[in-house]
Design a protein with these regions (language model features):
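Active-site-adjacent loops and short helices of periplasmic peptidoglycan-processing enzymes
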Residues: 1-139
């Protein structure tokens, strides 16, 4: 029994759709965006053991949106690899933002990389508007 309102089953070899339940409907991806954020960061950052200083620039917005955080604080030193874990395990929005800055210089530039990765993977109906998965009117 399938409980989810959305599902798609693909043939692993051919990529053809075997079954779909509202598979073409646009949905809000929420924290699933973080999977693409981490994938894009891994592809874009050459030294994941390098350290970074958590920028204070985005925290007010994350607090205002009640975003999930991993617990890294502004000004804290963190290894990029730890930010990858922080983005996925506790769904840390601050980790996603810092990875975006480290990988592309800004969230907007990073989102362009995310969208290019999606196209490269054949995800032609997928469009990202931010690195965190927080609600965006653009979907």
């Amino acid at each position: 029994m399938l409980v989810s309102p959305y599902a798609i089953l693909l043939d692993g070899e051919s990529g053809s759709v075997l079954a779909s339940k509202t598979g073409d409907e646009k949905i809000f991806p929420a924290s699933m965006v973080k999977v693409m954020t981490v994938l894009t960061a891994i592809r874009s950052i050459s030294d994941l053991d390098a350290t970074t200083t958590m920028s204070a620039d985005f925290y007010d917005e994350l607090y205002a949106q009640d975003a999930s955080r991993a617990g890294f604080e502004p000004g804290e030193e963190a290894k990029l690899r730890d930010l990858l874990y922080g983005a996925l395990l506790p769904s840390g929005a601050e980790c996603c933002m810092q990875l975006a800055i480290e990988a592309a210089g800004s969230e907007d530039a990073f989102v362009e990389l995310m969208n290019q990765n999606a196209l490269d993977m054949g995800l032609v109906q997928t469009h990202f508007t931010n690195a965190t998965g927080l609600h965006s009117a653009e979907k």
